A protein has these predicted regions:
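ATP-dependent carboxylate/acyl-activation modules
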Residues: 2-71, 81-108, 112-242
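Short, well-ordered beta-to-alpha junction loops that form the rim of enzyme active sites
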Residues: 78
């Protein structure tokens, strides 16, 4: 796959597990790919942050010895579920801060892991994301359609004075406001139409019946419905055009 990939690949992921280290790391170096450094070993999950740092350093040093560059490496914060490990978030924050402040490496993490098994997971994920960004998180694996999560990310970047983050936040909020206004306009129009129908407006009911008859190809009822509209005062061109 690396031979034919049209661009620079990002391998997800390479850990200290023997099979991955021996096979994938040399391939990444050979084909100039970036890779996500996953701080796991043959022993499984690291028992604490210090062991996680040791794994990161071991893989990092091995990558450089194969000719890879510092810029080729992105570290996975390795998020565990807080339901199983109450210190999961804190340990991830410490890992992110270590990579940012001491190793000068970018970081990534899967947000949803932190809240697995908990109710109303979106609030946990959002709080976790904002705190991780503050610690230096570079990238996150998340659902971009989740509005609360994305808004928090844009706001966090702005509060940390990241380049052009204020413009990005304002533009996003403006777009969301426009979308909300359009939605409310549609709802109001629908409510008005419903109110008109509930007040016994026969023309509206007949108009809808004609539309449904045309839509469904119901030839048997369309003539009677058109006649009803005409008797209610509708003009022929209005029936055709509307």
């Amino acid at each position: 796959a690396l031979k034919i990939y049209p661009g620079r690949a990002l391998i997800n992921s390479i850990s200290l597990e023997t099979e991955k280290m021996e096979k994938l790391l040399p391939l990444a170096a050979k084909y100039g790919a970036m890779f996500i450094l996953l701080p796991l070993s043959d022993a499984g999950l690291p028992k604490d942050v210090e062991e996680k740092k040791q794994i990161i350093n071991t893989i990092y040093d091995k990558a450089l010895s194969l000719g890879m560059a510092h810029e080729d490496i992105v570290v996975d914060g390795l998020v565990a579920t807080i339901g199983a490990n109450p210190k999961a978030a804190i340990e991830c924050y410490e890992t992110i801060a270590y990579c940012k402040d001491e190793k000068k490496l970018p970081t990534i993490c899967g947000l949803s892991n932190i809240s697995f098994g908990l109710p109303e997971r979106m609030y946990v994920n959002t709080a976790f994301l904002t705190m991780a960004i503050c610690k230096g998180l570079t990238m996150a694996i998340a659902n971009p359609s989740q509005e609360l999560l994305m808004n928090a990310a844009f706001a966090s970047d702005m509060l940390l004075d990241r380049p052009d983050s204020d413009i990005a936040y304002i533009e996003r909020m403006s777009r969301l406001a426009e979308e909300k206004a359009q939605y409310e306009t549609v709802v109001v129009k629908k409510s008005d139409n419903d109110a008109s129908a509930s007040n016994g407006t026969c023309a509206a009911g007949s108009k809808d019946a004609v539309f449904q008859a045309v839509l469904k190809g119901n030839k048997g009822s369309i003539i009677d419905e058109v006649k009803k509209m005409l008797s209610d005062g509708a003009k022929p061109d209005e029936i055709i055009n509307n």
